Amino acid sequence: MKRCCLTLLGLFLSVTMLFSQQQYKEAFRVAYEAFPQIPSGLLEAISYANTHCHHLTDANYVSEDANAMPRAYGLMGLVENGKGYFRENLERVSQLSGYAMEDIKADPVVNVMAYAKAFAILSNEEEVKTFEDNLQVVEQLSELPMGAAKDRYPMQSMLYSVCSFLNDRSKAETFGFEPYTLDLKALFGDDLERLSAKTLLIASDSDYPQAIWDPAPECNYGERTDPVSGVVIHYTEGSYAGCISWFKNCDAQVSAHYVIRSSDGQVTQMVREADKAWHARSANAYTIGIEHEAYGNVIDFFTEAMYRSSADLVRDICSRYETIDGHRTFYRDTLDNGICLNEGLHDLGGETACIKIRGHQHYPNQSHVDPGPYWDWNYYYKLINEGTPVTRLTGEEGDLDHRFYGDDERKIWVIESSEDTKITLDFSSFDLESDYDFLWIYDGDDVYAPKLGRWNTKSPGKVVSSGNVVCLEFRSDCATNDLGWRCHWKAEKPAPPEPPVEELPIGVYPNPASDEVYVNVGESVLAEVAIYDLLGNRVLPVVRFMGSTTVNVSGLPAGIYVIHYGQATVMESVTKLVVL
């Protein structure tokens, strides 16, 4: 069942990516047609590395903070205001192409065409001959600072994303180009191990063994004086490479401990957990900040790889800090009264609050609303808390009694009965702390099965599974317990289904007949039926009816007759009728 859920998530993200590609396919086609010297797929690869092939506008940004990353625009992710750090490649593309900056920002076709024209001009100037030469042009048109050798990692990371996209067969099929066979080792040399690492690299410099260590400068973080007791979930509103580069900008005065790449979940650590990163205002002192490569209203950035990588990281953090319990991960996206806690700002308390792993939007004195409504908190909670013991019950009938429950509970029960049965859960009592303690029931053998419901303020009453397995999951917060709940469960074989009621065909039947014949004209209209002998004499009165009727023929002598039927006054259908 879990594999099914993950497959559905992957399928959904693939569909959204395909929709994005199809939506802007014409923009890329026109650009390649105008500038055939640009290798097929390269424009899409650059766009995907920067924007996941989404046309970014101001509507994709929420943060107005001065220290937020510079905004990128259009399919190609061009920066207008680099805030004195990023290169302003929107202006350069405009100058090279002759297109106005406002048109490049507003129109996806112009955005790609302007970039392609600028790329072609630079290619001619550089006398591009090899693919490596093309990558140098990509660098020239990037917003990322060129930097000294020690600061090359963000640029290399962006170029790696471009090249790995081109080598990816599934991306090639989706975006309509022949997959490349680039030798990444030849292109990136010894840097390839770090650029391609997911969870295989052991980096002794980082707190988290699977993370790449690429430190932010000391100007962008401070000394921690308070104990760590929380985790803040962010999204970048920019690319992975761009975020890493931005945290190296002393003027930004911003950083996070970790940054996670959307495509494969790669983790880069930039500030040691023992130090105070600057990511959540007053919560900096006691929290660890994790940035996820995403825009809050572009759902396909939130990949399965990124969720899993982030959950693995948080689980590792929980193992090292007694003050952070995975059960205290935020998951209450919507309350029974309709309040959505994953949209807008919701102060869930400060350092002593129950919820220890939550979004930027959930801490006091904040202006950011990340990670926003597309972040699946309930799924994230399940990933962080994988390994919870499961109580398995078998048989045809029994009781579940979970009264007087405790704090910080996560309990899971799986009930399985004999095949060809359905399980009914009948709750005789149900009393949970409003808005904080919850019961889920799933139609299958684990918490990834289809959800039958979630309950908090109202009793489930009777809940019936579709098969012979049902799963219950209960969670409580860190304080205030109510009476709990009890239910009786019983497995029963469902009653055999009623035979389907088939629509009778248009016509006359039975035929031959002895008592009655059924006449059906197939629609609810005024109709008539008349019966004649072979000499043309009407032997029964004309019967008028709506749609269908029965005619008593028991009084007719045995023999052959002719029956006329159809819409009133027309009776266009004629059938031989045999009376026994």
Model-derived segments and spans:
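Extracellular/periplasmic catalytic domains that process cell-envelope and extracellular macromolecules
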Residues: 37-39, 68-71, 132, 222-227, ...
